[in-house]
Amino acid sequence: MTEAQRPASGRDDAAQAPEHRARCQDLRQDAVRLLGKERVRSDETTRFLHSYDASLERGYPDLVASPRDTGDLRALVAAAYHRGVPFVMRGAGTGYSGGALPARRGMVILTSDLDRILDVDTDEGRIRCEPGVVLATVQQHAARGGWRYLPDPSSYQVCTIGGNVAENAGGPHALGGGPTSNYILAVELVLPDGSLAVLDEQQPWEGGLDLRALIAGSEGTLGAIASATLRLVRAPESERVMLATFARQEDALATVAEVFDTGLLPSALDMLTGALVPGRPDYADPSLLFAGLQGHCEEVAGQSRRLSRIARRHGGRPELLDIPAFLQRRAELVRDKVRRMVAASGCPRYYLFDAVAPRSSLAALMDSIRRAAADSGLPVLNTFHAGDGNVHPTPFYDPDDPGHRTRLLDFSSQVLRECRGMGGSLSGEHGIGLEKLGLMRDFFPPETLEIMRAVKRAFDPAGLSNPGKVIPSAEQAAAGGPRRAARAARRVRQPGLHVRRIDALVEINDSAITFADVATALSGGPYELPYEPLGAAPGLSVIAALDAGLPALREPSPARPRDLILGADLDRNPGEPAVSLGGSCAKDVAGYELRKLVYGGRGRLGTLRAVRLRLLPRPTDSRLIRGPEMPIDTAEMLCALVRTADLPFCYLGVLVTASGSASVTGRAELRGGTLDRHLGILQSVSPQTPWDVTTGDRWTDPVMRALADDGTSLAGAPAGSPRQTALLRNLAGGGRAAFMSTGHRRVWWRGEPPSPSRRSGLTGRIISAFRAAPP
């Protein structure tokens, strides 16, 4: 972004007006009355200390308040609403985009005392906490119960959960597991008027929309997070890291391409390129590749062998390390690189930003970064997440050079423009904030930006929750016409089905394309679409299944259906152009996550025309596992016992037939090695149980047959004893088959749901935001 494009942080003219100052003074008095004088500060030092983060941006508040609990938080937000004063939540201030800085002054609300762990469920794998809880604390609580919380940004020791949710934080392991949004089960959100909304995972199945998707990555523009319930995954049985050293950057990039072309998916795949030092073509610096491997022992052993062979084939020197040795080795290597860079260039400081391109474009993007470094005259390192195309170009600079800021911004703008041309995104984990606001119009067509503005109005009609972030105003967006038009032209898509193997992506541009069609297109290759809708047949349309919000047989492992959606196209109103949501990058946190709302949209947001879906490696072994018939309550106890063994089930539950008999039913899968050892563990857990273990097509599993479409709707209700047992008995008594899914935490059957739709007024406003005609 150039200086001319950059907003004046914290210097909004309206914020300097006498009426604004008077409103802030009134709000300060309200806050003192609510919290006490010691929790409300407006002195110059406090204001300065909360005017910056890890970016180059600045934004000065009028006052800073520190609530003690959710009641305080709601009261503060309600007071700000009453006085018409903007507010912004602030955690640890580690953001790289200025997201937690006040663009229009007003009140900064600190989450430092909202730091309680509210609940830890080690049986179900859930943690509920307040927004000020440090990420490392969540990780520690998870580890004590044998679980892991996967998002792991580099600031994990100080950053907070509220900030992670607001920015949709990722980290190295977002490659294998996805960003923060994939792990949010529920959010308590204080709306900008002080009221409280609870958004949870069940809403898409109960007539609502999955509004959690909007909160993750919204940068606090839709309200204040009061608490978040987070999904945990089982701690891996085995964990190693392959470190490979390459003399040439091109060979490291070729290794990355082959890794994905052959269908490998490491839990993390990061790269540290050789340094680019202008005027020093002789500067020799190796490139390093770090591949994280997590999972069951068979998976890690198989992946490490394959990765090492690929690295050697491209001239790399691989070595396999345990985690402590890797962390020490990486710290030494990075420290040495930085010291040598500073010594060679004379530039002691660095500027870090992020951008994203499809991983198939990584080699071209590295060439673009090299050209931008030469054009700017800046020495550059690039430590980045090679597996998902999320780059972190890091130019070094001399702060005493009066032109350094302009050169840094010109460098970042040049790289981002190149990403745009490759079909990339503005951000993969840092967010938009103030830093990239002026570039949103170049990456998003006007109709998509208008939907985002309408979503903002639906949550925040008065525009008080962190205004001036994420979405440019209509006036700002109007300035980018020619480049927007070029992007719109590129959105013309060829009908049919297209597989992009290195990107592990399938593009479906025809509602007639079925799951069988996708399977045929992927046959013989290393990838699969991990989605078989419960009770469906392979002849079902993929787009129809997503639009209906049909639950997956395999859920949440390896992925929830909504988390497979990288991009989607909607026809909203007759005569209007299709609106494009998301894109085709494995990692994308630019703007609101509108694309995930199409899961369960049921035509209410528009007609779903196209989707871009993430693919995953095929399992090397997949077995159907079923216990004998037994009473319902006995089957529930056996299912709970089996869950404690931490076996690689992609789904597990209790299947109740129409005749009333029940059995524990599931499927185990590995992506590397065989299941033989795990089947032995299963037998040892329940020695008296004669398990029936078979192979076969998932589409013909007993659960799929029991819930097959009979002309009635697929209905469900939240699971949980003793209500769950009574529900299963009632369904069996009525001659209906049912499946209690531990992954969904829900009971499924064919017929009428037991309770009315949970469509809220907020859902209605979001639907209107999509349907409204563009300005």
Task: Label every PLM stretch briefly.
Residues 116-120, 127-270, 465, 471, ...:
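FAD-binding subdomain of flavoenzyme oxidoreductases
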Residues 122-125, 242, 350, 400, ...:
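Short beta-alpha connecting loops at secondary-structure transitions
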Residues 438-487, 758-775:
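Activity-critical C-terminal alpha-helical subdomain
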Residues 41-50, 230-234, 240-411, 418, ...:
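C-terminal substrate-recognition/cap domain of FAD-linked oxidoreductases
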Residues 1-78, 94-125, 154, 230-232, ...:
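N-terminal flexible segment immediately upstream of the FAD-binding catalytic core
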